[in-house]
């Protein structure tokens, strides 16, 4: 073989090798032959996939939020006038809540707070205030709103109604009172508001009352005396007998502990988060979370920025709330965690949870963090419905053997001084018509 022929053969062999290498490179570069690593990446669910999964869950499981302050928003903005376009609920309201966003958020049930503020200090517990009147007005406006938008909302007074309303495509609507001051510290008024449809009472708001100590008192550096004895105990007992949910949001840590010792039915926290994650006194300590699990109750996680991130509220975001959900699930179990956003009760909300339309995004993040479909179903609604059903069952049993509780606060005044001398209306009588002790008993 000549030197030239030998050179040509060598070139052909080299060219063949090069073509083989290029062919391999082409095959490796083609989409059909992805590496195991790239295949795994392609199989990883995206955020959109979790959101679709969340939407599917909320299509078949009612999302029930424990606390929304829309009624107070209405009171402050329109003085409870809702007709003639004053509250265009079907359109976008300036707050966090309206019908359009509730539907977008897949809300299946809502506890509407018929909140009225604590009396300004230093009003004594038994001083006459307008709290009960204002509470009745808030019950009235909320029920009128539900009736006005009855195509979309349905008033409910029990857990079965909530499920029926959801199956009919309506948003089940319930009432909650935020503080014992709203019933005038009276067990008689407790029974009356139950008759009007209220189904939970927060034991205190940001003030002590005849029943218990508020967390705000402890925040001010005063002692945590817990549940007031004996009247606070009688209050809890009567709520259990009625079937009224006992709500421990806003109360002091010792009030939480004392109540859990005497409660005969599961309790709720309508809008509180985990103290171990953010050490704000509005949140629930781990020892209490464990007792809630024993009690078969539920803690409904709130979204308020300064509660979920006490050190840096501006940094609070949707993942911060997920942290609270998972902590409560870890300590108490997935059977004892729920959602209570506190929309329209605050102006400071985490990034990603700006209004009621954002619930599916929260559920998507919970799924992305590793929660199962069954765990999410418990979180969004099954837990609070289980608790409510159990409270109703226990109440029926207690009502067979117990009469309405006639206890009263030992510091209460049973008469009030008259504004004028009633005897002056009856001058000339030989015997005064009214004695000084009875002057305040007449309401002419």
From Swiss-Prot:
The protein's required cofactors: Zn(2+)
Q: Sorted alphabetically, which PROSITE patterns does this protein's record hold?
A: RENAL_DIPEPTIDASE_1 (PS00869), RENAL_DIPEPTIDASE_2 (PS51365)
Where is this chain glycosylated?
413
Residues that bind Zn(2+) 1: 67, 69, 178
Among the Pfam families in the record, one is: Peptidase_M19
Name a single GO biological process: proteolysis
Keywords per UniProt = Dipeptidase, Disulfide bond, Glycoprotein, Hydrolase, Metal-binding, Metalloprotease, Protease, Signal, Zinc
**Disulfide bond positions:** 118-207
Top-rank lineage group of the source organism: Eukaryota
Q: Where does Zn(2+) 2 bind?
A: 178, 250, 271
Is the keyword Hydrolase assigned to this protein? Answer: yes
What's its top-level EC category? hydrolase
**What is catalyzed by this enzyme?**
an L-aminoacyl-L-amino acid + H2O = 2 an L-alpha-amino acid
**Role summary:** Hydrolyzes a wide range of dipeptides.
Indicate what this protein is called per its UniProt record. Answer: Putative dipeptidase CPSG_03667
Lineage, broadest ranks: Eukaryota, Fungi, Dikarya, Ascomycota, Pezizomycotina
